[in-house]
């Protein structure tokens, strides 16, 4: 090869330097001067023989060669012609060719030549006059489209101030009444107890009613102006004759910009005070989108640089075999794709976790408020202690060692009285211990003094066992039950299910 290999960046720099396409674009301060024209590099499946690549590299730059003129035959002639030829109807595009070396492999890159903007200055000068006529036509058409807004008002609320825009009438700044009490939320209603200001009025003929608005005798270019910014065009109307400004002594004025927005209804986007008593309002409207002159700029054309592998005749067989292998691997991978959608690492609908025999989801039970299920875990009746077996405890997911520890604690607190250890399930599950009271104590509870004694006993029990959600269960921590909230029963200290018994603690699981 006679030309030195270049990297991808060199191709892009060369393509940009050889093109004057940016000259067609109007200047915008937000544009990237090095971003136009735009290129992308593509590596299609295919190759070109070394002898044929040499012929492209040795020819004159910026030419449009025909592969049929090359006498040497290649095995994949159709593929090469499809890549090198331009896809346009009957016309051959101009290309330059460069050799690229990437990861030890040589490529022949075809760079499209973008037409230079300075090649036909006469045509550009002629188009300037046509452009002026087009701008005048677009201005007239824009005013015609906006005329549909006559008799309608738009509103905009910004903090204390609200604004009304009534086309062909005026723009007003006022304070709105708070909504409620018969005052609608929209449109905002003016509070006549505060000052309001007219920011600008549309020009009207003499003697015409100000509230109805009318067309002025001025030309369309005096009423409106078509401006271009960033490739998009919008209509501008400058309104004067507003209320007098206290600071400057001049009348207020406002500039209104109408922008095409096909996804929006007529609305005020924002309004700001550029300087004292001079304002700028931007309005989005789909009406202007009916004229192509106001449509948003289209996406810039991206030119494709195609790079194909350069092979010797001896390397063609190996390349074809590798290409066929890659195609077969793609077919295998597509066949192995999961039939069900995978979300969060779980194949939805595969029934790997539930849905088959032995993997059923237990139906939930809707428990109403106050509905509880009580099962006896252990109890002491007439001095005899009865406990559930280890297998039965496992059904309730209870630890045998913990139950034994709670049993000893109940024995200590009961002081020889009968007691019951229950597991209560409902909206959650917890253990509850109940100590039976003596008959004499039951009789004592009926009088006033007994109520006082029982209340004191209940308070002492709370100090010992603690309340739910409160830290510091000293006895509970010593017995290995730290972290399980404790509380008392109802205020009278009686269990509705067990007559003559007193609840000692409640241990949530």
UniProtKB/Swiss-Prot annotation:
It comes from Emericella nidulans (strain FGSC A4 / ATCC 38163 / CBS 112.46 / NRRL 194 / M139). GO terms for cellular component: endoplasmic reticulum lumen; endoplasmic reticulum membrane. Residues 75-91, 452-461 have a biased composition (Basic and acidic residues). The gene is yos9. Its main location: endoplasmic reticulum. It comes from the Eukaryota. A mannooligosaccharide derivative binds at residues 160-161, 173, 246, 252, 273, 279. It is found in: Endoplasmic reticulum membrane. PANTHER family: ENDOPLASMIC RETICULUM LECTIN 1, OS-9-RELATED. Residues 1-23 form the signal peptide. Lectin involved in the quality control of the secretory pathway. As a member of the endoplasmic reticulum-associated degradation lumenal (ERAD-L) surveillance system, targets misfolded endoplasmic reticulum lumenal glycoproteins for degradation. Disulfide bonds join 153-166, 245-277, 260-289. Residues 151-291 form the MRH domain. GO terms for biological process: endoplasmic reticulum unfolded protein response; retrograde protein transport, ER to cytosol. Residues 64-74 have a biased composition (Polar residues). Keywords: Disulfide bond, Endoplasmic reticulum, Glycoprotein, Lectin, Membrane, Signal. It is a peripheral membrane protein. A motif (Prevents secretion from ER) lies at residues 506-509. Residues 436-451, 489-502 have a biased composition (Acidic residues). Residues 64-91, 433-509 are annotated as: Disordered. This is Protein OS-9 homolog.
